Design a protein with these regions (language model features):
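Glycine-rich beta-strand-centered segment in the early N-terminal region that forms part
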Residues: 8-53, 69, 89-91
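NAD(P)H dinucleotide-binding glycine-rich loop of Rossmann-like/cofactor-binding domains
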Residues: 48-126
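Hydrophobic/small residue at the entry helix of a nucleotide-binding pocket
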Residues: 106, 131, 199
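Adenosine-nucleotide cofactor-binding segment
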Residues: 122-128, 140-202
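C-terminal hydrophobic helical "lid"/dimerization subdomain
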Residues: 201, 246-294
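Rossmann-fold dehydrogenase core element
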Residues: 209-216, 225-267
Length: 294
Protein backbone atom coordinates (compact mmCIF):
# COMPACT_ATOMS: atom_id res chain seq x y z
CA UNK A 1 0.00 0.00 0.00
CA UNK A 2 1.06 3.60 -0.51
CA UNK A 3 0.61 4.01 3.24
CA UNK A 4 3.29 1.35 3.82
CA UNK A 5 5.66 3.13 1.44
CA UNK A 6 5.17 6.39 3.35
CA UNK A 7 6.00 4.62 6.61
CA UNK A 8 9.11 3.08 5.05
CA UNK A 9 10.46 6.29 3.50
CA UNK A 10 9.75 8.52 6.48
CA UNK A 11 6.75 10.26 4.98
CA UNK A 12 4.74 9.13 8.00
CA UNK A 13 6.70 9.36 11.27
CA UNK A 14 6.47 6.25 13.44
CA UNK A 15 8.20 5.01 16.57
CA UNK A 16 11.70 3.57 16.23
CA UNK A 17 11.59 -0.17 15.70
CA UNK A 18 8.02 -0.17 14.45
CA UNK A 19 7.22 -3.32 12.43
CA UNK A 20 5.75 -2.12 9.11
CA UNK A 21 3.02 -3.36 6.75
CA UNK A 22 -0.65 -2.76 7.48
CA UNK A 23 -1.94 -5.84 5.67
CA UNK A 24 -1.30 -9.51 6.20
CA UNK A 25 -2.87 -12.95 6.15
CA UNK A 26 -1.90 -16.19 7.81
CA UNK A 27 -2.85 -19.06 10.09
CA UNK A 28 -3.55 -18.82 13.81
CA UNK A 29 -0.88 -20.76 15.68
CA UNK A 30 -2.27 -20.43 19.21
CA UNK A 31 -5.07 -18.68 21.10
CA UNK A 32 -5.30 -17.30 24.61
CA UNK A 33 -7.66 -18.79 27.22
CA UNK A 34 -10.20 -15.95 26.86
CA UNK A 35 -10.41 -16.09 23.06
CA UNK A 36 -13.80 -17.25 21.78
CA UNK A 37 -13.85 -16.22 18.11
CA UNK A 38 -10.89 -18.22 16.82
CA UNK A 39 -9.07 -21.49 17.18
CA UNK A 40 -5.71 -22.87 16.14
CA UNK A 41 -5.52 -23.39 12.39
CA UNK A 42 -8.04 -20.70 11.39
CA UNK A 43 -7.04 -18.66 8.35
CA UNK A 44 -7.35 -14.94 8.98
CA UNK A 45 -6.35 -11.54 7.64
CA UNK A 46 -5.55 -8.31 9.41
CA UNK A 47 -7.60 -5.18 10.00
CA UNK A 48 -6.15 -1.78 9.10
CA UNK A 49 -8.10 -0.17 11.98
CA UNK A 50 -8.44 -2.95 14.59
CA UNK A 51 -10.49 -0.76 16.94
CA UNK A 52 -13.09 0.11 14.29
CA UNK A 53 -15.39 -2.87 14.56
CA UNK A 54 -18.65 -1.41 13.28
CA UNK A 55 -20.62 1.78 12.86
CA UNK A 56 -19.47 5.11 11.49
CA UNK A 57 -15.95 6.47 11.64
CA UNK A 58 -14.96 8.12 14.93
CA UNK A 59 -11.48 9.38 15.83
CA UNK A 60 -11.06 6.94 18.71
CA UNK A 61 -11.79 4.04 16.38
CA UNK A 62 -8.97 4.88 13.97
CA UNK A 63 -6.11 5.87 16.30
CA UNK A 64 -4.65 2.36 16.21
CA UNK A 65 -3.30 1.76 12.69
CA UNK A 66 -1.60 -1.54 11.88
CA UNK A 67 1.98 -1.01 10.72
CA UNK A 68 1.85 2.64 11.80
CA UNK A 69 0.84 3.47 15.36
CA UNK A 70 1.00 -0.23 16.28
CA UNK A 71 3.20 -3.03 14.94
CA UNK A 72 2.35 -4.44 11.55
CA UNK A 73 2.52 -7.68 9.61
CA UNK A 74 6.13 -7.86 8.33
CA UNK A 75 7.03 -10.65 10.76
CA UNK A 76 6.81 -14.41 11.12
CA UNK A 77 4.61 -14.31 14.23
CA UNK A 78 2.41 -11.59 15.74
CA UNK A 79 0.41 -11.42 18.95
CA UNK A 80 -2.84 -9.52 18.40
CA UNK A 81 -6.30 -9.09 19.87
CA UNK A 82 -8.96 -11.47 18.62
CA UNK A 83 -10.73 -8.39 17.22
CA UNK A 84 -7.71 -7.40 15.11
CA UNK A 85 -8.41 -9.98 12.39
CA UNK A 86 -11.25 -11.31 10.27
CA UNK A 87 -11.51 -14.57 8.40
CA UNK A 88 -9.96 -14.86 4.94
CA UNK A 89 -12.14 -15.26 1.86
CA UNK A 90 -12.51 -18.91 0.91
CA UNK A 91 -10.54 -19.88 -2.18
CA UNK A 92 -7.79 -17.29 -1.87
CA UNK A 93 -4.12 -17.84 -1.10
CA UNK A 94 -2.53 -16.04 1.82
CA UNK A 95 -0.88 -13.62 -0.61
CA UNK A 96 -4.17 -12.86 -2.35
CA UNK A 97 -5.99 -12.31 0.94
CA UNK A 98 -3.20 -10.06 2.20
CA UNK A 99 -3.94 -7.58 -0.61
CA UNK A 100 -7.45 -6.82 0.67
CA UNK A 101 -7.50 -5.18 4.14
CA UNK A 102 -6.48 -1.71 2.93
CA UNK A 103 -7.02 -1.45 -0.84
CA UNK A 104 -9.97 -3.81 -1.04
CA UNK A 105 -11.78 -2.36 1.94
CA UNK A 106 -11.19 1.21 0.77
CA UNK A 107 -12.76 0.36 -2.59
CA UNK A 108 -15.61 -1.48 -0.88
CA UNK A 109 -16.51 1.39 1.46
CA UNK A 110 -16.26 3.93 -1.37
CA UNK A 111 -18.45 2.02 -3.79
CA UNK A 112 -20.82 -0.09 -1.74
CA UNK A 113 -21.13 1.59 1.66
CA UNK A 114 -20.88 5.28 0.82
CA UNK A 115 -21.63 5.03 -2.89
CA UNK A 116 -24.47 2.47 -2.76
CA UNK A 117 -23.36 1.31 -6.22
CA UNK A 118 -25.90 -0.75 -8.15
CA UNK A 119 -26.00 -2.81 -11.32
CA UNK A 120 -26.23 -0.54 -14.33
CA UNK A 121 -24.21 2.27 -12.73
CA UNK A 122 -20.97 3.56 -14.22
CA UNK A 123 -17.57 3.99 -12.56
CA UNK A 124 -14.31 5.77 -13.35
CA UNK A 125 -11.10 4.32 -11.89
CA UNK A 126 -7.72 6.00 -12.21
CA UNK A 127 -4.49 4.12 -12.81
CA UNK A 128 -3.53 0.53 -12.10
CA UNK A 129 -2.69 0.50 -8.40
CA UNK A 130 -4.28 -1.68 -5.77
CA UNK A 131 -7.42 0.33 -5.00
CA UNK A 132 -8.25 1.00 -8.65
CA UNK A 133 -7.81 -2.62 -9.71
CA UNK A 134 -9.91 -4.14 -6.94
CA UNK A 135 -12.53 -1.41 -7.46
CA UNK A 136 -12.71 -2.45 -11.12
CA UNK A 137 -13.12 -6.10 -10.13
CA UNK A 138 -15.79 -5.39 -7.50
CA UNK A 139 -17.67 -3.15 -9.91
CA UNK A 140 -17.71 -5.68 -12.74
CA UNK A 141 -18.90 -8.39 -10.36
CA UNK A 142 -21.79 -6.05 -9.45
CA UNK A 143 -22.81 -5.39 -13.05
CA UNK A 144 -21.31 -1.91 -13.34
CA UNK A 145 -19.80 -0.32 -16.46
CA UNK A 146 -16.19 0.79 -15.86
CA UNK A 147 -14.02 3.44 -17.50
CA UNK A 148 -10.34 3.12 -16.58
CA UNK A 149 -7.42 5.48 -17.14
CA UNK A 150 -3.74 4.66 -17.52
CA UNK A 151 -0.60 6.16 -19.03
CA UNK A 152 0.42 2.85 -20.61
CA UNK A 153 -1.20 1.16 -23.59
CA UNK A 154 0.16 -2.17 -22.41
CA UNK A 155 -1.49 -1.71 -19.03
CA UNK A 156 -4.60 -0.61 -20.86
CA UNK A 157 -4.84 -4.02 -22.50
CA UNK A 158 -4.59 -5.67 -19.10
CA UNK A 159 -7.38 -3.41 -17.81
CA UNK A 160 -9.57 -4.54 -20.69
CA UNK A 161 -8.76 -8.16 -19.87
CA UNK A 162 -10.05 -7.54 -16.34
CA UNK A 163 -13.31 -6.24 -17.76
CA UNK A 164 -12.88 -2.48 -18.22
CA UNK A 165 -15.47 -1.34 -20.76
CA UNK A 166 -13.45 1.71 -21.85
CA UNK A 167 -9.78 2.59 -21.36
CA UNK A 168 -8.32 6.08 -21.79
CA UNK A 169 -4.59 6.81 -22.00
CA UNK A 170 -4.33 10.09 -20.12
CA UNK A 171 -0.74 10.56 -21.29
CA UNK A 172 -2.09 10.87 -24.83
CA UNK A 173 -5.34 12.66 -23.96
CA UNK A 174 -4.97 15.81 -21.86
CA UNK A 175 -8.74 16.28 -21.89
CA UNK A 176 -9.44 12.77 -20.67
CA UNK A 177 -12.25 13.83 -18.34
CA UNK A 178 -14.09 15.33 -21.33
CA UNK A 179 -13.56 12.02 -23.10
CA UNK A 180 -15.15 10.23 -20.14
CA UNK A 181 -18.22 12.44 -20.48
CA UNK A 182 -18.46 11.75 -24.20
CA UNK A 183 -18.27 7.98 -23.98
CA UNK A 184 -20.70 7.83 -21.03
CA UNK A 185 -23.22 10.33 -22.43
CA UNK A 186 -22.75 12.89 -19.68
CA UNK A 187 -20.45 11.44 -17.06
CA UNK A 188 -20.09 8.54 -14.64
CA UNK A 189 -22.09 7.80 -11.50
CA UNK A 190 -19.02 7.11 -9.37
CA UNK A 191 -15.37 8.18 -9.41
CA UNK A 192 -12.52 6.64 -7.43
CA UNK A 193 -10.00 9.50 -7.21
CA UNK A 194 -6.50 8.41 -6.26
CA UNK A 195 -4.58 11.41 -7.57
CA UNK A 196 -5.80 14.08 -5.18
CA UNK A 197 -4.48 17.46 -6.25
CA UNK A 198 -3.63 16.40 -9.79
CA UNK A 199 -6.92 14.70 -10.63
CA UNK A 200 -9.72 16.14 -8.48
CA UNK A 201 -10.87 18.71 -11.03
CA UNK A 202 -10.83 16.03 -13.72
CA UNK A 203 -12.98 13.86 -11.45
CA UNK A 204 -15.44 16.71 -10.90
CA UNK A 205 -15.66 17.22 -14.64
CA UNK A 206 -16.07 13.49 -15.38
CA UNK A 207 -18.87 12.91 -12.86
CA UNK A 208 -22.46 13.14 -14.02
CA UNK A 209 -25.02 15.40 -12.34
CA UNK A 210 -25.70 14.01 -8.83
CA UNK A 211 -22.64 11.78 -9.17
CA UNK A 212 -20.31 10.70 -6.38
CA UNK A 213 -16.56 11.18 -6.01
CA UNK A 214 -14.57 9.17 -3.48
CA UNK A 215 -11.24 10.73 -2.55
CA UNK A 216 -8.97 7.85 -1.57
CA UNK A 217 -5.44 9.01 -2.42
CA UNK A 218 -2.99 11.87 -2.86
CA UNK A 219 -0.61 10.44 -5.43
CA UNK A 220 -0.77 13.67 -7.44
CA UNK A 221 -0.48 16.11 -4.55
CA UNK A 222 -2.18 17.20 -1.35
CA UNK A 223 -3.69 20.47 -2.60
CA UNK A 224 -6.06 21.06 -5.49
CA UNK A 225 -7.45 24.01 -7.44
CA UNK A 226 -11.04 23.17 -8.29
CA UNK A 227 -14.10 24.77 -9.83
CA UNK A 228 -16.27 24.98 -6.72
CA UNK A 229 -19.44 26.16 -8.50
CA UNK A 230 -19.28 23.01 -10.65
CA UNK A 231 -19.58 20.89 -7.51
CA UNK A 232 -22.83 22.44 -6.35
CA UNK A 233 -24.28 23.13 -9.81
CA UNK A 234 -23.87 19.41 -10.59
CA UNK A 235 -24.97 18.58 -7.02
CA UNK A 236 -22.05 16.21 -6.56
CA UNK A 237 -21.26 14.21 -3.44
CA UNK A 238 -17.54 14.45 -2.70
CA UNK A 239 -16.22 12.55 0.29
CA UNK A 240 -13.05 11.13 1.72
CA UNK A 241 -12.71 7.40 2.26
CA UNK A 242 -10.06 5.73 4.40
CA UNK A 243 -10.35 1.93 4.60
CA UNK A 244 -13.26 0.82 6.83
CA UNK A 245 -14.54 -1.23 9.74
CA UNK A 246 -14.44 -4.93 10.57
CA UNK A 247 -18.12 -5.22 9.66
CA UNK A 248 -17.40 -3.68 6.26
CA UNK A 249 -14.50 -6.09 5.79
CA UNK A 250 -16.76 -9.06 6.47
CA UNK A 251 -19.20 -7.77 3.83
CA UNK A 252 -16.36 -7.29 1.35
CA UNK A 253 -15.19 -10.85 1.99
CA UNK A 254 -18.63 -12.20 1.12
CA UNK A 255 -18.64 -10.17 -2.10
CA UNK A 256 -15.18 -11.44 -3.06
CA UNK A 257 -16.38 -15.00 -2.51
CA UNK A 258 -19.68 -14.66 -4.35
CA UNK A 259 -18.04 -12.83 -7.25
CA UNK A 260 -15.14 -15.30 -7.35
CA UNK A 261 -12.77 -12.34 -7.41
CA UNK A 262 -9.05 -13.08 -7.55
CA UNK A 263 -6.89 -10.13 -6.48
CA UNK A 264 -4.22 -9.17 -9.00
CA UNK A 265 -0.65 -9.65 -7.74
CA UNK A 266 2.11 -8.11 -9.85
CA UNK A 267 5.10 -9.37 -7.87
CA UNK A 268 5.87 -11.37 -4.75
CA UNK A 269 9.06 -10.90 -2.71
CA UNK A 270 10.59 -12.72 0.22
CA UNK A 271 10.36 -10.76 3.45
CA UNK A 272 14.16 -10.45 3.45
CA UNK A 273 13.85 -8.45 0.22
CA UNK A 274 11.36 -5.91 1.55
CA UNK A 275 13.58 -2.97 0.54
CA UNK A 276 13.61 -4.22 -3.05
CA UNK A 277 9.82 -4.54 -2.95
CA UNK A 278 9.45 -0.94 -1.78
CA UNK A 279 11.83 0.25 -4.51
CA UNK A 280 9.69 -1.50 -7.11
CA UNK A 281 6.55 0.05 -5.65
CA UNK A 282 8.13 3.51 -5.75
CA UNK A 283 8.90 3.04 -9.46
CA UNK A 284 5.14 2.97 -10.15
CA UNK A 285 5.60 0.23 -12.74
CA UNK A 286 3.42 -2.33 -11.00
CA UNK A 287 -0.06 -3.45 -12.03
CA UNK A 288 -2.13 -4.39 -9.01
CA UNK A 289 -0.49 -5.40 -5.75
CA UNK A 290 2.99 -6.26 -4.50
CA UNK A 291 3.21 -8.89 -1.77
CA UNK A 292 5.74 -10.29 0.69
CA UNK A 293 5.95 -13.98 1.55
CA UNK A 294 7.35 -15.45 4.75
Amino acid sequence: NYHDLLVANGGLPVSDGRIPMSDGAGEIDAVGPAVTRWQKGDKVMSLFFPDWQEGRHRPERTRAVTGDSIDGCACEYAVVSENAVTRMPDGLTYAEAATLPCAGLTAWQALMVRGQMQAGDSLLVQGTGGVSIIALQLAKAAGVSVVATTSSNAKGERLKALGADHVINYAEDNDWSDTVKKITAGGVDHVIDIGGGATLQHSINAARTSGQISLVGILGGVTAKVNVPMIFSKQLQVYGVAVGSAAMQEAMIRAVESGQIKPVIDADYDLANIAEAFAYQASAQHFGKITLSI
